[in-house]
Amino acid sequence: MREKLSLWAIFCLVVAFLPSQTESVAVMSVDLGSEWMKVAIVKPGVPMEIVLNKESRRKTPVAVCLKENERLFGDGALGVAVKNPKVVYRFLQSILGKTADNPQVAEYQKHFPEHQLQKDEKRGTVYFKFSEEMQYTPEELLGMILNYSRTLAQDFAEQPIKDAVITVPAYFNQAERRAVLQAAHIAGLKVLQLINDNTAVALNYGVFRRKDINSTAQNIMFYDMGSGSTTATIVTYQTVKTKESGTQPQLQIRGVGFDRTLGGFEMELRLRDHLAKLFNEQKKSKKDVRDNLRAMAKLLKEAQRLKTVLSANAEHTAQIEGLMDDIDFKAKVTRSEFEALCEDLFDRVPGPVKQALAAAEMSMDEIEQVILVGGATRVPKVQDVLLKSVGKEELSKNINADEAAAMGAVYQAAALSKAFKVKPFLVRDAAVFPIQVEFSRETEEEDGVKSLKHNKRILFQRMAPYPQRKVITFNRYIDDFVFYINYGDLSFLSEQDMKVFGSQNLTTVKLSGVGSSFKKHSDAESKGIKAHFNMDESGVLILDRVESVFETIVEEKEEESTLTKLGNTISSLFGGGSSEPSANVTEPVTDEEEVTPEAGKEQDQPEKQEETVQEKPETEEGKEAEPQAEEQKEDKEKAENQGETESEKTEKPEEKTTDEEKEADMKPKLQKKSKISADIAVELEVNDVLDPSAEDMEGSKKKLQDLTDRDLEKQEREKTLNSLEAFIFETQDKLYQDEYQAVVTEEEKEQISGRLSVASSWMDEEGYRAGTKLLKEKLSELKKLCKGMFFRVEERKKWPDRLAALDSMLNHSNIFLKSARLIPESDQIFTDVELKTLEKVINETITWKNETVAEQEKLSPTVKPVLLSKDIEAKLSLLDREVNYLLNKAKFAKPKPKDKAKDKNSTSESSKANSTDDAEKVIPPKTEDGAEKVKPAEEPPVVEEKAEETILELNPAENTDDKTESTESSKSENHIEDEL
């Protein structure tokens, strides 16, 4: 009984952990650019695919239009921007995580004077004020856009999606990254990771060229010029050995250079201003076109088109109908004029390359190729200047410049999701900005003079790999104190970049409870105050915890024999163990070196970092080689364990003599060092950009949910309005069709026609202002009125097919019944009851059909029919069930054995003839299907072998009926596997 219960418990446990069939398994990525976004998904059956928007385009403008009663996104929002630019918000990336006094906020206001930016007095950031009721922060607007991207992905995937990987520029600092995470939280998205867009591009490049990656390092530079910024990245590809998955390819970010404001949008603004100047010079209007916001929006749209055309043509004519005051504009612009307008921008093209080389401490001779990414790299002058600066023969264009980041990010999303299994590809991203810890400590000189000494400890050097955990130990504090988390040396940034960067001070950390922990453990030796830091996969620095660590010496119990240990372990499993909670003194003490300001790059100091506990071996940090210190520690432990094992082997189970016992008593007891840790209370004070409070976040989520509900209500109303309008017009037309006129009386026809006319008039006068509820009521009333007419028409349409099917079934059933009754009694497999039951069903069905059809023919077409399609289907189902029952019985019936005694006793010729006839009538036994398959000339079917490593194990199981196919077909038709 106990065994049965155990098996049942295991079965329930297994079922509990099986994935639900309705559970969402699709994941998405959003390549969030300054002007455009690309969305990609992974789902079962669709390995990696770019999502098409409602206009069937592969990229969508990052724009949202907020009118008083509706929202528009993407291309719809851009269409409104030409007519009413005040209600359209775009290029939000440049003001995320920025305070009101940041130069980029002023630059944004200059480019978009139609918007009214106000300072948030609580956080110091900005928000858009359209009216007293309509005020939105950049995070809220970005949250709307991210929610729209999820809507596109869900429509494309045909299932709900909540997990996403979002790209951000590599130069985003802590405040900017937190702002994107806040926007995603407002949108209700679960962010698996914020991945740098240059890293996503590098991952996409490596995934599709993994066969070309070997142990020899390959250095490749990606030059990405988008709409708003430019980034140059040096990436090293090579294979490395890992404990979890053997030798795997790896990419490592070695150097990053960037220019925050160099991009295609700045070129378009120069063209826009040039076109405005040309229009003013034509003097067709006394007004200055630059004072007209709508006209400037039209000029910007034309400048965007003009830039694209001039990339392929030497000259082109810009033209806009009704630019201002119904005046048309037309002017010719040459490529040379465009290049002259942007000359200073082209001079900045080599800048990011030089920064990346300096960060990586490499030269261009070590770079194998330079690959172009981003739409603005299509400008010929950009390519010419870049080619000269890198000194290569050519620039590579062997990846999709627009979609590479989205595809790399969605690969990472699949790797982070538990629903997919992907081929491992190790990613070592790098922190662009160094981070350090600063604190002050009172010191006493030899002459007794006390002074305050300011100390710095580097947490993450420039280009330090992450995700990574670090521990800093404060050894000389015995009371509460304060330390600061700040950015490190940013001298590599220009003066303008430093202004845009914002505050260099990240967080003030106030510790309390240090003194009380020392008093509590006064008899133990202090090992310092340890602060545990974690830079996660998104590049966001988190202070996990702070603890006060003490070391104490405890007497170790005498070594127990192996059998005693085993007995204690088994007894504890069955309730014999102690019920008291274990104390926090069980961890062995390990010396953690304090991070010093002289520390080199993180990859050169592996002993000073704490290994991150991994849950998924596919992620980057879990696949990296163990640090040197960890290996030394393992070797030491292994040696100790080996020594213990040898000592145990030498022990004998013989009883000790009295002298031995005395000698054992005289031996000193073993002593062991144990660690005691006490958590320290932490108070964090953010110094760069304050995060929204929990109350503000809930308010933002409610604000967006209200807008979403309003949009859904509007869509529902429009859908109901269209349905009502279509029903009126279609029904009015049907009243004049022959099949409908045949089933209605003149009185009924006039009633329906009159009600439809009244509803049509109401629609023209009041319907377009009516609410959804009233529209649904009107539609329901009309459908109820016409229900009888539609029912009669539908029934008459179904009769021919249904009756023909019934006649066919009756015919086949009769033939089957006659054949069954012709079977000799000695071979009969059906009972009389079974055959009589089938005969009864056939006769009753024939009688019902004849009587019902005859009754229906007497009725007028305008009354409710007695011959109903559902009744015919019920009769069909009953006949089919009875016949199938007998067919299945015949299929599995065993032939009766031959009567040998009767054949032996037969003496007359006639008897012999009869017995021979009987023998001929015996049905031979059916051979098993499996026996027919295995023939001498053919191999038996085998289980299919997978040619490659399985990727995405989420295809629906194949139909088991297909297993009866031949061996050749089973070998040729392998399972289709989604491969990333």
Curated annotation (Swiss-Prot):
Which Pfam family, any one, appears in the UniProt record? HSP70
Which InterPro entries does the record cross-reference, listed alphabetically?
ATPase_NBD, Heat_shock_70_CS, HSP70_C_sf, HSP70_peptide-bd_sf, Hsp_70_fam
Example GO biological process term? negative regulation of hypoxia-induced intrinsic apoptotic signaling pathway
Q: Name one GO molecular function term.
A: ATP-dependent protein folding chaperone
Q: Does the keyword Signal apply?
A: yes
* Compositionally biased region (Polar residues): 907-916
Q: Which residues form the signal peptide?
A: 1-24
* A cellular component term, taken from the record's GO annotations: endoplasmic reticulum chaperone complex
Q: Where is this motif: Prevents secretion from ER?
A: 977-980
Predominant location category: endoplasmic reticulum
Q: Where in the cell is it found?
A: Endoplasmic reticulum lumen
Superkingdom as given in the UniProt entry: Eukaryota
Its keywords, alphabetically, are: ATP-binding, Chaperone, Endoplasmic reticulum, Nucleotide-binding, Signal
Extent of Basic and acidic residues compositional bias: 599-656, 896-906, 918-949, 960-980
Which segments carry the region annotation Disordered? 558-682, 894-980
Which family does the UniProt entry place this protein in?
A: Belongs to the heat shock protein 70 family.
Q: What does this protein do?
A: Has a pivotal role in cytoprotective cellular mechanisms triggered by oxygen deprivation. May play a role as a molecular chaperone and participate in protein folding.
- What is the protein name for this chain? Hypoxia up-regulated protein 1
Origin organism is Danio rerio
